[in-house]
Amino acid sequence: GIDYRNSVFQNIDGSTRIAGLWDQTIQTGNAPKAFDYGSEYREEMLNEALRSEDPLSIVPTTDTNGHGTYLASIAAGNADVNTQFLGAAPEAILGIVKLKEAKNYLRDFYLIREDAVCYQENDIMAGLKYLNDLAENEGLPLVLCIALGTNFGGHNGTTLLSRILDQYALQLNRSVVIGCGNEAAMRHHFSYTISEKMSQPVTAEIRVGSGINGFVAELWTKLPMVVTIVLISPSGERTRQVAFRQGYRYNFVFTF
């Protein structure tokens, strides 16, 4: 989300620099065209709210965790003499999407912690379309700034979201900016180059923190390379050798 009341997102006369704001979490307003959920607040309504003594009574959207306001101010915040602050593009017009958090069944499936912020890929793709449509209606170029991260996927550009971003980046007057993350030393990934001459299996240790009820891990390989795995519990119990086959599911129960 974004704190639209912050002066770094306003013009000199106090009017907003936000052309459109889609809050996917609020269902009491009018949804944007082509969508059936959330509430859209355009420039006129935001200005009405800013002129009011109680802006949130007119436009009730807020920044839940401060992340969106922080990023938007770095990218396009006005100059603030008192704090000696200036965003990268202080005269840019802004389009904002506040994503709704992922549904509980998805969080349960992927064993997402209750305190973790998590979004659905389809809502992200819907947000991209909203911003692209907004830019087209306003006749403006568009820089899509996406400061979200994930440790899932093959990281090879083949996911649906990756392909959609590629298509936006190929369009005239469209650019895509992705946050590179700040978890370089967290060791979330393991990679290995497998050759046909290998005679010994490759061992990868997964460190699970205390108090964790479970985790999800993904194994990616390139076709036609076929791999098999053996899972070894901390107590030394081993599963049989498992080959990956589409549509198959395996359940293993360890004693400890």
Walk through the language-model features, giving the residues of each.
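Generic structural signal for well-ordered beta-strand positions
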Residues: A19, T239-R240
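Glycine-rich, phosphate-binding/catalytic loops in enzymes
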Residues: Q10-R17, L161-S162, I194-E196
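Substrate-binding/access-modulating region of protease and related hydrolase catalytic domains
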Residues: K103-I194, G211-T239, Y248-R249, F254-F256
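Non-catalytic, beta-strand-enriched accessory regions in extracellular/secretory proteins
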Residues: S195-G209
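Exoplasmic/lumenal beta-rich domain surfaces
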Residues: G29-E44, R240-F256
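Subtilisin-like serine protease catalytic core
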Residues: G1-Q120, G139, N173, I212-F215, ...
